[in-house]
Amino acid sequence: MSAELPSIPAWEPVPGLYILATPIGNLGDITLRALAVLRSAALVACEDTRVTGKLLKHYGIKARLQRLDDHAPPEVRARVIDEARQGPVVLVSDAGTPLVSDPGYRLVREARAAGVTVTSIPGACAAVSALAIAGLPSDRFLFAGFLPVKDKARGEMLEGLAGVAATLVFYETAPRLVKSLHAIAGLWPEREVAVARELTKLHEECRTGTAAGLAAHYAAHPPRGEIVLLVGPPAEAEAPVQDTDTLLRAALAEAGPGKAAGLVAKATGIDRAVLYARALELKGA
């Protein structure tokens, strides 16, 4: 005898701002509490009204939608906060938990300053889901959002995190994944890395290995979908990171990418193929 699915609980609408997580892929991951709050919402503030509109339609929910992203002017946030004084206003992102590399920080800060109650309606989060299945140390982790697009900025950000004794968690796009893996391999060739993609969807995958090995795999098999990139913490005996970009630039001033990669490989012990790929990126920058 199969158990009946629980019904959506009754909820007495209470004024305030509700930060509500939505599914990151599998629509079955919405919570009963989230559905109850959405059904009673006076207003749903969202990144994209089309995306949220489709989501609500799937659950049979009708709601008034207000586009609100990081570019929204102060007067739009002020109107949303005024509504939250009168009834329940929900903030959602396109997928996952709002404010985790998504808009909403300014709205929450201003709502709290205005004395509006802010409540979390928890649910899916890609960063936490990836950490849970990657097999990397999870007792301490640092979520750092998206890696910068520019090579120099990306390298500087990674170097700044070199001494963090925790698993590093990033969001990344499919087109930039291989470049980011090359950058990580140049700094931390021995660290364990995980690439989690299409989380909760049909083709969910979590692949682990060195950054160089993963870069080679995804160069041959270009990925699709949303990606979470995780880097394990440094080993206790890990030597200070050398600035390989500086070494490569100096070598490139005197030689071509192949020879420059060979020279730096001898000096650092980093895989020549990884350095060669990075040398080509620097030469084309």
Question: Where in this protein do the model-derived segments appear?
Answer:
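Class I SAM-dependent methyltransferase SAM-binding "motif I" and its flanking Rossmann-like core
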Residues: 106-164
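Short phosphate-binding loop-to-helix
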Residues: 70-83, 103
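Generic beta-sheet signal
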Residues: 16-20, 85-93, 141, 166-170, ...
